[in-house]
Amino acid sequence: MASLRGVSRSARALQPFSAQFAVRRCASTQTGAGAAAATPKSNIPDLAELETRSALDAPIPSEEDKKEFRPWKRAADRKARLPSSRYQYHPPKYNRGPLHPIQSPPSSDPIARDFVPGPFNMPRLKETFRTVMASDLMTLAYIHTPPGTPKKEPTERLRAWEGDSPYFANRARRAPRGAPELPIRERDISFRNIPEIKEITVSTFVPLGLKNPDLLIVARAVLLAMTGTMPEMTRSKNNVVQWQLQANKPAGCKTTIYGNAAWEFMDRLIHLVLPRIKDWKGVPASTGDGSGNVQFGLNPEDVQLFPEVECNYDMYPAKMIPGCHIAIKTTATSDRQAKLLLQSLGVPFYSN
């Protein structure tokens, strides 16, 4: 390859210069009375080497020159590839802080390490929610604040140390009661933070899978058909004799779907599965973890109603299809907002 490049360079050196470059001369090399009369000589030695003619005076290319100028034809006739640049940018593997001179590109950049292509489609339920239901949800949760109303400072929820000990001064406040962390505060819904579905986790518990491994295989195949993602096996943490569980042994499987896949799963669940459940009251109103997440379960008979399972029903043994638990994680900050979101999508709730 290097020898070919040397031959091309020597061939270009032997080619005579064209008349186009020979006509244009510098001011210092111009000779003749006509050139001396037409071109005023500069008294400044630094400007003597400058060209006096402008590039705007160059002749306009003719039609023949335009037809002969075909760069695409020259590229097509080139048999060997041009040498590529040796420099290739690789994003950093670790993020060393905002002050480091080398920063990771944003996740939307195709060269980023965490780049995820897409989205490739718009789910029907997601489009309906954003165009129709989002404005209604924001109107239902609207809280009017008159102009000029001073903002209330949030109260301190952590307890201070009380006593005469001098070590209590400037000491961090006490931990909350009943939990290692404080629950999140409920934020008012505005056009900036309308609740949406963030992710959905589908899990199943198969306590008899230790004796009959086929139950775990069927459960994993059912979750794979329902969600379109490969489930991971879950293991029991402790020994439970009543449920025939052993520590660190497979006891079920789970999978989590995000983004458009979560909206499509929710669409099938609301419009194809839940309406066909006989004598189903709905989701208990007492469900929720206080942070905007809602959980409910389905029986084995209800799981069979999913279209992905129903179309290949003969592939799964009827008595081995398990039930499942569905945990819907939303961007809401309270159970009230999460239930309001799911009710607008079509999930019924009931209270005893």
Swiss-Prot record:
Biased composition (Basic and acidic residues): 63-80
Region of interest (Disordered), residue spans: 28-109
Cellular localisation: Mitochondrion
CC per GO annotation: cytosolic large ribosomal subunit; mitochondrion
Keyword Protease: no
Disulphide-bonded residues: none
UniProt GO MF annotations: RNA binding; structural constituent of ribosome
This protein's UniProt keywords: Mitochondrion, Ribonucleoprotein, Ribosomal protein
Similarity comment text for this entry: Belongs to the universal ribosomal protein uL5 family.
Function as written in the Swiss-Prot or TrEMBL entry: Component of the mitochondrial ribosome (mitoribosome), a dedicated translation machinery responsible for the synthesis of mitochondrial genome-encoded proteins, including at least some of the essential transmembrane subunits of the mitochondrial respiratory chain. The mitoribosomes are attached to the mitochondrial inner membrane and translation products are cotranslationally integrated into the membrane.
UniProt-recorded name of the protein: Large ribosomal subunit protein uL5m
The organism of origin for this protein: Neurospora crassa (strain ATCC 24698 / 74-OR23-1A / CBS 708.71 / DSM 1257 / FGSC 987)
